[in-house]
Amino acid sequence: EPQAAANAMIAGNQDIDAAMTYEPYLGAVRAKPEAGKIIATTLDYPMVMDTFGCTPKFLKENPKAAKALADGYFAALDMIKADPKKSFEIMGADVKQSGEAFEKSQAYLRWQDRSANQKFFAGEHAQFSKEAADLLLEIGIIKQIPDLKALADTSFIQ
């Protein structure tokens, strides 16, 4: 859980060497720098953000739903631009924050639109996947490197 991870870091839990969390919980770590170091955010690596994925079976059986899911994400980004106050209220409610508090948290996010997603999957994704696969193989998490070109179906972000 991202909130629990942040809380453990700022509490100084000796059993925690590293944790993955996100805004608004990352803000708690940012506010207490002696508790931990933030290594990377979407400001450093724009595509490190929430992701969604579907199984190949789902994509094959439900291409319209998959396209609608991607288009819905991009519509949400349009709403953030067009009506940020309302957008921050909605998103803040999901993480138990006021709209004003969420607005401050989201200042540390870089929202990736359709064009940025297309750019990422046109090159950066392949490089990242190769580096990740090499590392996972080296440390024994995977036994062989999968077909990296089959990891993402980008037709839904076109």
Please annotate each region the language model reported.
Residues 1-11, 24:
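Short helix-initiation/N-cap motifs at beta->coil->alpha
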Residues 49-64:
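A bilobed periplasmic-binding-protein/Venus flytrap-type ligand-binding module shared by bacterial periplasmic
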